[in-house]
Amino acid sequence: MSEVGIDDIALHFPRLFFAMQDFAEFRGADYGKLNKGLGLEAMAIPDVHEDTATMGANAVSRLIDRNSLDPSSIGRIYLGTESALDGAKPTATYIMDMLEQRYSAKFGDNCFRNCDVVDMTFACIGAVDAMHNTLDWVARGGEKRHRVGIVVFADNAKYDLGSSGEYTQGAGGGAILIRHNPRLLAIPDIWGVSTMPVHDFFKPRREVETRTVVENVLELAEESGASITANLAERILKFIPRSSKKNDVLFENEKLMIHKDTPVFDGQFSNRCYSESVKQAFIDFRSKAIVEERYNPDEDEILTNQWSRIIVHLPCLLYTSDAADDT
């Protein structure tokens, strides 16, 4: 059986950026810690016309052009993101739409019609799940069917201004070409998995009553010096069902559901979660390798000593050696 893995990678970043040295001076932060400790040089910022879909589409387009791919040969485009544009349809459909507009003149209308697209969301690792799925799909087709898949990763990572996570903001996208006999990296079919249902980082939908919105607006009016009559908020709320604004999104229901792109998070708790997950994933990988007779702990060198590189999520950097030693 031929190997399956990463054949090529293309990246796209916005041209606008905030240099980390300037950010450190602006916030009074330690530039040495940000640059030398965490490897941060600049914070990419999407322009007004850029979002998750445009960044992903640019990366895929670069991958297609560089590898002279016929869109009809691409069986799937799976996107990993936590910055989706729509609550119903995959952001990958917007990427596909832009790609069709770009390539239809050369390859015909609907040149991506038979391409499967979907989004996968799991904080920072959604694209890993998308890649795992795509690797299995390509491998299952066999070398003769020559399946080609693209994994896209794109995000606009935002934090509240002045928050402890603000310096980790950024934006960008990338595309990974998955197929048989890869030029860059062959990926075996043993995966170590560790999933924990913890609340260290999430983007919940918040519920706000219309009454609260009206009362806050009136309070702002008073602060600005406007004269507000007694019980005005109550009168407005009673009048809304008969008003010309009754069907506006702000007033059509008694409560509003608000989604913010910035997360609720606990950085130190996240670090502990990352460390434990990496450790447990290594243990799971080791167990599976033993079951499939690819690793004998009594005769073989320990797994982590066999690998030339171990790549982990950045907050895991200081914890990796401890987790690996226990494996």
Predicted features and spans:
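Condensing-enzyme catalytic core mediating Claisen C-C bond formation in acyl metabolism
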Residues: 1-49, 166-283, 289
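Conserved small/polar residues in nucleotide/adenosyl-binding loops
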Residues: 319-326
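A glycine- and small-aliphatic-rich helix-loop capping segment at beta-alpha/alpha-beta transitions
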Residues: 90-105, 135-140, 165-170
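Membrane helical hairpin/interfacial module
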Residues: 71-95
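Cysteine-centered functional microenvironments
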Residues: 44, 78, 111-129, 162-166, ...
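Phosphate/pyrophosphate-binding loops at sites that engage ATP/ADP/AMP, CoA/4′-phosphopantetheine
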Residues: 59-74, 281-306
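Active-site-proximal alpha-helical scaffold in enzymes
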Residues: 118-146, 155, 160, 168-169, ...
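A short, small-residue-rich loop immediately preceding and capping a beta-strand
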Residues: 75-78, 145-155
